[in-house]
Amino acid sequence: MPKLAGVIIAKTIEEAVKKIKLHEADLYELRVDYLESMENIELLLPHSNKLIVTVRKVEEGGAKRIEEQERLKLFEKFAKIKPAYFDVELYSNIVEDVINLSSKIGSKVILSYHNFSKTPSYQTLQSILDSMIELEPDIIKIVTYARDFRDNIEVIKLYENSENLIAFCMGEKGKISRIFSALYSPFTYVSIDNSVAPGQFTVGEMRKILELLGETK
């Protein structure tokens, strides 16, 4: 069955660990921008090989505004547990710093782009993808908002010429692209309790869909 990454929204590290233990997934994206306390990071060590550390900037869906240098300090703080992945935005002043940090500690890089208002044209998306490829990340993530069902096609077409790509549309009209992404991406994102992004499936919903499609272990 395709891999699923459960999105962890928590106020404390203890709460995050509890959610990881309660909900079975292949990977877990820890949204550091939602944390109110950074104490006891070491509690995540037993799960670090399944952890995606994300400090999302507010312009791309982050929970709160965090200055770029402060975001970099948070990435450096979580580098102590050597997570499987760091997720950093293409359009970020610290993108190269995070890529270098990941290289030093042996973590992989997810280079991401999010547009919460629309889906740009295929040509624009391809240009963004080309810029991301130049930075040689391990995985590229492109997420847009579907205003129309046809927006799914613009995003899905990106798979024609790219490997290690995660691309889908948010919103009710973008759900079909999430299913496509689950089938053709290294992994796809699901919620484990409350949905973080519009149109996001839960772990149970996505597993059921994949079973119906014959994608079983």
UniProtKB/Swiss-Prot annotation:
The UniProt record lists the keyword DNA damage: no
Gene Ontology terms, MF aspect: 3-dehydroquinate dehydratase activity
Name of the top EC class for this enzyme: lyase
UniProt entry tagged with the keyword Lyase: yes
Highest rank taxon of the organism: Archaea
Residue numbers binding 3-dehydroquinate: E29, L30, R31, R56, R178, Q200
Cross-referenced PANTHER family: 3-DEHYDROQUINATE DEHYDRATASE
Subunit-level organization: Homodimer.
Name used for this protein in its record: 3-dehydroquinate dehydratase
Organism per entry: Pyrococcus furiosus (strain ATCC 43587 / DSM 3638 / JCM 8422 / Vc1)
